[in-house]
Amino acid sequence: MYALNGRVGLVTGGGGGIGRAIALRLAGEGMAVAVLDRDSSAAQSVAAEIGGFAITADVTEPEQVDRAADATLGRFEKIDLLVNNAGVAWMGPALDTPLEALQAMLRVNIEGTFIVSRAVLPHMIARRTGSVVNLASWAGKTGPAFFAGYSASKFAVIGLTQALAREMASHGIRVNAICPGIVVDTAMRAAIEAQQRRYGLPETAEREKSIPIGRVSIPDDVARVAAFLASEESAYMTGESINLSGGLLMD
């Protein structure tokens, strides 16, 4: 157990998948959690599960994000942890990638991460404490085939993480990234496998064979690392991009 009682976290994209798992894990460790999602019903559902605070906002809209940060501060008076989890992906050959899909990935994955960080960090600076956790990806380190746009967006997240870590260290704020490998949950597995079949890509069961641990990740694997980065157990860590791929990526 991590000592997160009395702390406040804001999780973007908290209405499902990895974001939901992170919100549940943090709440289970005693943290008060604001669940931000552009899907109002999803945010409210997760908030109800954990006794948290639901916020409806689109991370690509600065005014909405500013209001979300203000609402969180109005409710809890502080933000100790920011988890930039909101993201979108598209899988397929680079030359088949719709321009709209590329733009969406860049807009949400990197611009959204920047916009939310810019809204929250001044409050952390004022208190001279805080932790920011960005969701990157193993694809942000290796550039795997069939993930060109997604990979580009996650390389950018890692770069942003390192730059912010250097700028924020003197203010007592740590900034780190988690780089999951292949994460699959029940809700998304069917959609992923449909795309794999469409382009003749290796199916999930086949890809598992390339993972030394022998399975794909589940959202709670990521949530456990997020809780660690929220805690004082990681007090000497900043600017890190933590591989969480079951050995798929080793560096």
Model-inferred region functions:
Residues 83, 169, 174, 237-239:
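Short, small/polar-rich loop/turn modules that mediate ligand/substrate recognition or access, typified
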Residues 122, 166-170, 235:
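Alpha-helical segment proximal to the catalytic Tyr-Lys
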Residues 137:
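Residue(s) in the substrate-gating loop at a strand-loop-helix junction
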Residues 117, 153, 161:
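Active-site helix of classical SDR
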Residues 177, 201-233, 237, 244-246:
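C-terminal helical subdomain
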Residues 93-94, 101-106, 193, 207:
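Substrate-binding pocket helix/loop in short-chain dehydrogenase/reductase
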Residues 3, 142, 227, 238-251:
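Short C-terminal tail/terminal secondary-structure segment
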